[in-house]
């Protein structure tokens, strides 16, 4: 699993290469017949990976907030790169004395701040249960555009899904 981020970077680089001049174009961009349900190219795989494994980030009246579960990592770093990228890095090393084993884990995640958010105002907090929260306050002018209203909930009194027994009951009564 450690090589997965490197694999995605390689895939992105390959996607930028000229497509027709490569003898491997068909291999990387045209799926075999048996893979009808699989993504069509590396960009789709990268988008799927981003959507599937991206931590929940929210933008609300308090600002931009990103949460990560890092309870298994002891060495944590949060850095700001290029005034718009937040880099989160975590390491964990464990040594078992009984069996002489050693395990090491490392992650590196990059997040691009939404446009207009100031990187120098990034703050991070770590809760006692291992949740890292990265926050950035809303830039001036954004708070006026974020409107909140409460929506009333109307109860229908009917089930959303019809039970499987209803068709049998009707057939039995006929």
Swiss-Prot record:
It comes from the Eukaryota. The modification Phosphothreonine is found at residue 152. GO terms for molecular function: identical protein binding; unfolded protein binding. Residues 44-154 form the sHSP domain. One of its GO terms (biological process) is protein refolding. The keyword Phosphoprotein applies. Residues 152-174 are annotated as: Disordered. InterPro entries: A-crystallin/Hsp20_dom, Alpha-crystallin/sHSP_animal, HSP20-like_chaperone. Keywords: Phosphoprotein, Stress response. GO terms for cellular component: cytoplasm; mitochondrial matrix; nucleus. Gene3D superfamilies: 2.60.40.790. Residues 159-174 have a biased composition (Basic and acidic residues). PROSITE patterns: SHSP. Belongs to the small heat shock protein (HSP20) family. PANTHER family: HEAT SHOCK PROTEIN 22-RELATED, HEAT SHOCK PROTEIN HSP-12.2-RELATED. This is Heat shock protein 22. It comes from Drosophila melanogaster.
């Amino acid at each position: 699993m450690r090589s997965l981020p490197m694999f995605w970077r390689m895939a992105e680089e390959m996607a930028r290469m000229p497509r027709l001049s490569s003898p491997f174009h068909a291999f990387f961009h045209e799926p075999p017949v048996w893979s009808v349900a699989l993504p069509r190219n590396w960009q789709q795989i990268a988008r799927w990976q981003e959507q599937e494994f991206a931590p929940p980030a929210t933008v609300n009246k308090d600002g931009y907030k990103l949460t990560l579960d890092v309870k298994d990592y002891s060495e944590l770093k949060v850095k700001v790169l290029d005034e718009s990228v937040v880099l989160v890095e975590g390491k964990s090393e464990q040594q078992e004395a009984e069996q002489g084993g050693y395990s090491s884990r490392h992650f590196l995640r990059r997040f691009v701040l939404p446009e207009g958010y100031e990187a120098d105002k990034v703050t991070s907090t770590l809760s006692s249960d291992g949740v890292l929260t990265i926050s950035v306050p809303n830039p001036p002018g954004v708070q006026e555009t974020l409107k909140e209203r409460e929506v009333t909930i109307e109860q229908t009194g009917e089930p959303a899904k019809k039970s499987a027994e209803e068709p049998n009951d009707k057939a039995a009564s006929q």
